[in-house]
């Protein structure tokens, strides 16, 4: 596999969750991740979703930088998602969100 994105609708909250985004190391920085994100954004708009959400780890600086470049903002964190020592281990779960234009909280990238 060279790249993939997995999305999951949350009906009760009208959100679209990105549960997996992966691009092979040798194909990174070629626009593939951006293309996959644009597909997710298009799907979210088609479905009338209000926000796209995803999670990453505080130690994954490359992913955080990429998501921010795609217009995602920090919307929360969980300091004990993985272990009871997440903060000590510098591996806190970050929740990020991209608000769609049809939302009253629209954020333009």
Residue ranges, per PLM feature:
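A generic structural signal for short
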Residues: 28-29, 51-52
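Alpha-helix C-cap/termination motif
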Residues: 10, 46-47
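C-terminal "cap" of GNAT-fold acetyltransferases
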Residues: 50, 57-61, 70-73, 80-109
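Alpha-helical transmembrane segments of multi-pass integral membrane proteins
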Residues: 44, 53-56
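Conserved acetyl-CoA-binding loop-helix of GNAT-fold acetyltransferases
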Residues: 23, 29-46, 65-69
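Short alpha-helical
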Residues: 13, 61-62
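Acetyl-CoA-dependent GNAT
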Residues: 1-19, 24, 37-38, 80, ...
């Amino acid at each position: 596999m060279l790249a993939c994105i997995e999305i999951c609708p949350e009906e009760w909250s009208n959100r679209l969750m990105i549960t997996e985004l992966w691009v092979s190391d040798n194909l990174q920085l070629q626009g593939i991740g951006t293309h996959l994100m644009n597909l997710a954004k298009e799907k979210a708009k088609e479905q009338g979703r209000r926000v796209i959400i995803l999670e990453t780890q505080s130690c994954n600086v490359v992913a955080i930088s990429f998501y921010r470049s795609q217009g995602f903002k920090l919307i929360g964190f969980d300091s004990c998602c993985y272990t009871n020592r997440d903060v000590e281990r510098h591996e806190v779960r970050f929740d990020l969100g991209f608000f769609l234009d049809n939302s009253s909280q629209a954020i333009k990238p």
